Amino acid sequence: MTQEFNYGTGRRKTATARTRLYSGTGKIVVNGRPYDEYFPRKSLQMIIRQPLALTKNVESFDIHVNVQGGGVRGQAEAVRHGISRALLEVDVEMRSSLKRAGFLTRDARKKERKKYGQRAARARFQYSKR
């Protein structure tokens, strides 16, 4: 039998997180592994828990996340974005606090592409006057 869940998609840089919130005890699973195993750095674990701590729902939901693309920081921030969006489906009253904290805003900053005739996105080749 399928269990009722709330869904949220989060993105950051090239990372995409598909998040499902089930009513439960606070267990977070990322790509089939516990989140503290998938993100061993405490700072990244804190990023993931931020929307839950802000809305006082740390032990109210079991969260299953499928995240792809990007690096570990981008993935953690995509998960945070996805959890925040899924929490809105649970209770729309959380919107103001989540919005104020900036968890609902898609951070659109991406890596700028390298241009031809230059060494990098903005850096030019070294120029010798003489």
From Swiss-Prot:
Q: Source organism's superkingdom?
A: Bacteria
Entries under InterPro entries matching the protein:
Ribosomal_Su5_D2-typ_SF, Ribosomal_uS9, Ribosomal_uS9_bac/plastid, Ribosomal_uS9_CS, Ribsml_uS5_D2-typ_fold_subgr
Q: SUPFAM superfamilies, per this entry?
A: Ribosomal protein S5 domain 2-like
Q: Tell me the PROSITE patterns matching this sequence.
A: RIBOSOMAL_S9
Q: Which GO terms describe its molecular function?
A: RNA binding; structural constituent of ribosome
Give the region (Disordered) as residue ranges. Answer: 109-130
Single GO cellular component term? cytosolic small ribosomal subunit
Alphabetical keyword list: Ribonucleoprotein, Ribosomal protein
Would the keyword tRNA processing be found if you checked this record's keyword annotation? Answer: no
Does the keyword section mention Ribonucleoprotein? Answer: yes
- Parts of the chain that traverse the membrane: none
One of the GO biological process terms:
translation
Question: NCBIfam families attached here?
Answer: PRK00132.1
Family in the record = Belongs to the universal ribosomal protein uS9 family.
* Name of protein: Small ribosomal subunit protein uS9
Q: Which organism is it from?
A: Oleidesulfovibrio alaskensis (strain ATCC BAA-1058 / DSM 17464 / G20)
Question: Lineage of the native species?
Answer: Bacteria, Pseudomonadati, Thermodesulfobacteriota, Desulfovibrionia, Desulfovibrionales
Q: Gene symbol? A: rpsI
